[in-house]
Design a protein with these regions (language model features):
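A polyanion-binding, active-site-adjacent surface
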Residues: 1-213
Length: 214
């Protein structure tokens, strides 16, 4: 059944905040503590348990006809001097793609979202997935895109349609001719030597698809 109007309204606020790329702080223990006690509203729906609210930070970039959605394990935005960013640049160069460009003014996609110190609407896994996919759909409508690289387990989980579709190196349809590509995280590529040869094998198969759009 369709969500109630209040849920749709709150989810729409979340999506608009993500598309705008405005800096919004993620939930921390400190921000969850208020200085004054409030009388609970018995008519309000129960707040979701903390365990039901996913927490992640993702960086959105573009390289030629490819969008890149990368896990940020520490929650901090990419810096050009970071080893993982340099690795990404090298991988793209080997794939025949231009250097990556940060989108959303470099501001990461953070989840959950806060609005005036409180959770901004629905924050469960389904809401996170819907918001991330809506943001990717918005970006593909702004520029010609054929592939979206999902670098890391969180990018895979919340950009794919369902968790079970997050098989490494799998290609899944997204919107029209755009396809999602599940790729190891940059951190994993730096730590596990066996992943780079596997990545290169898959890159060689896919390179003709995006090089024809140069």
């Amino acid at each position: 059944p369709p969500p109630p109007d209040s849920a749709r309204s709150s989810l729409q606020q979340v999506r608009q905040a993500l598309e705008a790329g405005v800096p919004i702080k993620s939930v921390t223990q400190e921000s969850a503590v208020t200085s004054t006690a409030k009388v609970p509203d018995s008519s309000a729906p129960p707040a979701p348990a903390a365990a039901d609210i996913p927490r992640f930070s993702l960086q959105l970039l573009r390289s030629g006809p490819c969008l890149l959605l990368a896990d940020l394990p520490l929650g901090e935005a990419f810096q050009t001097s970071d080893p993982d960013f340099q690795l990404l640049r090298d991988v793209l160069h080997a794939a025949g793609l231009p250097p990556p460009q940060l989108l959303r003014r470099g501001e990461p996609i953070r989840w959950p979202l806060l609005s005036t110190g409180a959770l901004a609407g629905t924050q469960d896994g389904a809401a996170a997935r819907a918001s991330v996919r809506d943001l990717l759909e918005h970006e593909t409508s702004q520029q010609p895109i054929t592939f979206i690289w999902l670098l890391g387990p969180r990018a895979m989980r919340f950009a794919n349609r369902a968790d079970e579709e997050a098989e490494l190196f799998a290609l899944t349809p997204f919107l029209g001719h755009v396809r999602l590509w599940n790729v190891p995280s940059l951190e994993a590529l730096m730590q596990e030597r066996t992943l780079k040869p596997q990545l290169w094998q898959h890159l060689q198969k896919l390179m003709p698809h995006w090089n024809r759009h140069d």
